[in-house]
From Swiss-Prot:
GO terms for biological process: protein folding. GO terms for molecular function: adenyl-nucleotide exchange factor activity; protein homodimerization activity; protein-folding chaperone binding; unfolded protein binding. HAMAP family: GrpE. Residues 1-40 are annotated as: Disordered. The keyword Cytoplasm applies. Participates actively in the response to hyperosmotic and heat shock by preventing the aggregation of stress-denatured proteins, in association with DnaK and GrpE. It is the nucleotide exchange factor for DnaK and may function as a thermosensor. Unfolded proteins bind initially to DnaJ; upon interaction with the DnaJ-bound protein, DnaK hydrolyzes its bound ATP, resulting in the formation of a stable complex. GrpE releases ADP from DnaK; ATP binding to DnaK triggers the release of the substrate protein, thus completing the reaction cycle. InterPro entries: GrpE, GrpE_coiled_coil, GrpE_head. GO terms for cellular component: cytosol. It is found in: Cytoplasm. Pfam families: GrpE. PANTHER family: GRPE PROTEIN, GRPE PROTEIN HOMOLOG, MITOCHONDRIAL. This is Protein GrpE. Residues 14-25 have a biased composition (Polar residues).
């Protein structure tokens, strides 16, 4: 042994064999898929599968997008039709009032009494139609003035308390608790001393 190959006193001596210097035992061996009979898919196969999955997902996305667009268009059409035909039922009910007025005008020898009774019946039809669609009349004579329901046209001296409706010049109307026309009224200033 030469000086370089001599073992040092604190290091064990190593020997080299013709086989590999480290021998594997059966427990330490890692098994590959080829050894177990399973064929590992090639990169081309994995790429092809990924492309098919991507195409499926893209197709599903396109269908969902188209369905969403169709729903949006249908909803928009429903809203447009609701605005366009909102008063269809009300209009249908008013046709009977129109028919009554035309029938009254068609009578050639109508007396004042016949004409008046026909107008009263027509007014009843109109009032019934209003009630059916929850249109209520505001006739607030003698009530306290409410600026949400009434429009004051003038202030007058009166025996009634201050801010009381003295006279209704034009009736108002409310649709489902929303004023569609305020009542035009004159309001009491109260007594002057």
């Amino acid at each position: 042994m030469t000086e370089e190959n001599r073992p040092q006193p604190d290091q064990p001596e190593l020997t080299v064999t013709s086989e590999s210097s480290v021998q594997e035992t059966g427990e330490n061996k890692a098994r590959t898929p080829e050894q177990e009979g399973e064929a590992m898919p090639s990169l081309e196969q994995l790429l092809k599968k990924a492309e098919l999955d991507a195409a499926e997902h893209y197709d599903a996305w396109l269908r969902a997008k188209a369905e969403g667009e169709n729903i949006r268009k249908r909803a928009q059409m429903d809203v447009t039709n609701a605005h366009k035909y909102a008063i269809e039922n009300f209009s249908t009910e008013l046709l009977s009032v129109m028919d009554s007025l035309e029938a009254a005008l068609a009578v050639e020898n109508a007396t004042v009494e016949n004409f008046k009774s026909g107008m009263e019946l027509t007014l009843k039809q109109l009032t019934a139609t209003f009630a059916k669609f929850n249109i209520k009349q505001l006739s607030p004579q003698g009530e306290k003035f409410d600026p949400h329901l009434h429009q004051a046209m003038c202030m007058v001296e009166s025996e009634l308390p201050h801010n009381t409706v003295v006279q209704v010049m034009q009736k108002g109307y409310v649709l489902n608790d929303r004023v569609i026309r305020p009542a035009l009224v004159s309001v009491s200033k109260g007594k002057e001393s």
